[in-house]
């Protein structure tokens, strides 16, 4: 049986790529940014997209009306990670608290309050569930607020799940909040063995920076020669920052300083580190291909993962298409913003079973 669903703070819809294949029928979506909303529509032309600020009362009423007319029973939301990291005396804290626009999770509450939903899924970065939000004159954790508001109607499960435990070659922890009516069964997915980078992308041919291969999406951005030299002398799992001789340099020859995980290669026997919105930057955290030892003692592939490799470790179909004009930077950004599709699918459809109200 099809269940009508809606997606709030949908971004470009990357996380939903496997959801629309199940029995969830996404009829309504909302995204603030036009380019991302247009990309969502490219992927899901049958879903009605309401582009704009969800805190705008007129737009919110339109979204709610559409959801009611379509008898939406499933809500997916990824609100921005906004809140207070601690409860203390901060001269800016009172001003921050008084502006509800700083707490967009409250917009999600309005939809839960109005719609007779069977399932609610809120996902975000792990620190989201450690933040404090103003509620009834107090600063409370999200779990505390949810239990006050909804424990009488919904079972509330809050967990941290890591993509690497669910058949995805990427260590990507996410905070998962599931709310579902009492009497409904919605179990957690079964943990699977980790997938190494060797198994996931080891079959792909090496690439030099700036090289465009004949394989779709398998090309490498260019890199400054001095950086290439430093990375060639960097072993898997280590950072070029700590190399004694061949290290990243500025144009004037001065040594570049950075954290231990910048200019760092991945490791073949582990899943990829989390793919962020900066996955195309060779200097950003844990972004460099593991490389293979060469006869001269250096290592191949002094580059970031290609888009194809990024798709693979993010559980995205290798033959995916994007709207015309989508730049590599944009594609990497929207992937970095999203939960890996296979993880979201595993949560919604545990063990491959359709979600059901029985």
Swiss-Prot record:
Q: Where is the active site?
A: 81
EC class name: transferase
User: What Pfam family is a match, any one?
Assistant: DNA_methylase
Q: Which UniProt keywords apply?
A: DNA-binding, Methyltransferase, Restriction system, S-adenosyl-L-methionine, Transferase
Stretches assigned to the SAM-dependent MTase C5-type domain: 3-358
For the biological process aspect of GO, one term held by this record is: negative regulation of gene expression via chromosomal CpG island methylation
What are the protein's GO molecular function terms? DNA (cytosine-5-)-methyltransferase activity; DNA binding
Catalytic activity, reaction form:
a 2'-deoxycytidine in DNA + S-adenosyl-L-methionine = a 5-methyl-2'-deoxycytidine in DNA + S-adenosyl-L-homocysteine + H(+)
Checking InterPro entries in the record gives: C5-Methyltransferase, C5_DNA_meth_AS, C5_MeTfrase, SAM-dependent_MTases_sf
Enzyme Commission no? 2.1.1.37
More info? The HgaI modification system consists of two cytosine methylase genes responsible for modification of different strands in the target DNA.
Family the entry assigns? Belongs to the class I-like SAM-binding methyltransferase superfamily. C5-methyltransferase family.
Recorded protein name is Type II methyltransferase M2.HgaI
């Amino acid at each position: 049986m099809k269940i009508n669903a809606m997606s709030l703070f949908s971004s470009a819809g990357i996380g939903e790529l496997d959801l629309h294949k199940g029995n969830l029928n996404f009829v309504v979506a909302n995204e603030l940014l036009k380019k991302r909303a247009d990309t969502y529509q490219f992927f899901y032309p049958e879903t009605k997209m309401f582009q704009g600020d969800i805190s705008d009362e007129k737009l919110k009423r339109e979204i709610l009306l559409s959801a009611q007319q379509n008898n939406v029973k499933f809500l997916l939301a990824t609100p921005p990670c906004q809140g207070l990291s601690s409860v203390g005396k901060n001269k800016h804290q009172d001003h921050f608290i008084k502006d509800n626009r700083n707490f967009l999770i409250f917009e999600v509450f309005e939809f839960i309050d109005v719609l007779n939903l069977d399932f609610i899924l809120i996902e975000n970065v792990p620190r989201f569930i450690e933040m404090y939000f103003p509620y009834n004159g107090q600063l409370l954790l999200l779990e505390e607020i949810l239990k006050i508001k909804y424990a009488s109607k919904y079972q509330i499960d809050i967990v941290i799940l890591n993509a690497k435990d669910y058949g995805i070659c990427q260590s990507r922890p996410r905070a998962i909040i599931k709310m579902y009516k009492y009497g409904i069964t919605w179990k957690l997915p079964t943990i699977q063995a980790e997938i190494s980078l060797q198994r996931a992308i080891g079959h792909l041919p090496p690439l030099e920076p700036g090289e465009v291969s004949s394989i779709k999406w398998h090309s490498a951005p260019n890199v400054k020669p001095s950086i290439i030299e430093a990375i060639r002398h960097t072993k898997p799992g280590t950072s070029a920052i700590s190399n004694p001789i061949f290290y990243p340099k500025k144009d004037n020859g001065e040594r570049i300083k950075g954290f231990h995980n910048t200019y760092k290669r991945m490791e073949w026997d582990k899943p990829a580190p989390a793919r962020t919105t900066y996955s195309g930057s060779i200097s950003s955290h844990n972004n460099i291909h593991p490389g293979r030892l060469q006869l001269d003692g250096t290592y191949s592939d002094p580059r970031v993962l290609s888009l194809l490799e990024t798709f693979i470790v993010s559980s995205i179909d290798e033959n995916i298409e994007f709207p015309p004009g989508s730049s590599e930077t944009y594609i990497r950004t929207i992937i970095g913003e999203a939960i890996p599709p296979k993880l979201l699918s595993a949560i919604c459809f545990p063990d491959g079973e359709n979600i059901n109200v029985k």
